[in-house]
C-alpha cells in the first residue's frame, strides 16, 4: 500500500516492531507512522486512531489484522485462554472497526474496513474452537457493518486466507504435533494443506494484493468474504 502512495499507520502491541516496519518504509521514501495498540484495550484503540488523525487527517482504509493462536484439546481448553483469544479476535475487531467507522462517518467521505477472517470462518478445525468461534463472527460482523455503513460510503470486506507460513503458523506446527500425537510433517500435509486442491500455502503477498484490489472497490463487493484458500473452502 505504501508503494502505491498510501500513508500507512503500523499499529501493534509491540511498538518496537511497529517502529522498525515504519522506519523501513520511511527509509525507502514512503510515508508511515508507528503507534502502539492493544486491540483489546478500548482506550488504546481510540488513542491510536486519534494519533493517526492528528498526523494524516483522514481514515480511508483500515485492516483489522491482530491475531494470536492458542491451541488445546477442547475438553482441556482453559477458560483464561478462551477469553484471551476472544478478546483479540472478536472484541479487538469490534473496537478497531468501530473506531474506523466513527471517523469515516464523521469525515463525510466514507472509507473501507477490511476484516481478517480465515478459512476457519467456514470450516471447523481441531484444537481451535475459540478461533473458529471468533472468525465466524468476524465474517458476520462485516456483513452487518456493510448494511449500516452503506449510506455513509463505508464498505466492508473480509479476507479469509488458509494457512500462511507466518511465525504464528510456524509456532502451531510443533504444538499441534504434540497435542495430536503426530509428526510435524503430518501436521503440514494432513492438516494444514490436506483440503487445498494443490497442497500450497497461501502467501502474505496474496493477502496484500487482495487488500490493494479492495482499496479500489466502489462498493460492488461490500460485505463479501474473499476466500484465499487454494480451493479449501469454495463458495
Q: For the regions a protein language model found, what residue spans apply to each?
A:
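Short, small/polar-rich loop/turn modules that mediate ligand/substrate recognition or access, typified
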Residues: 63, 150, 155, 221-223
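Active-site helix of classical SDR
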Residues: 97, 134, 142
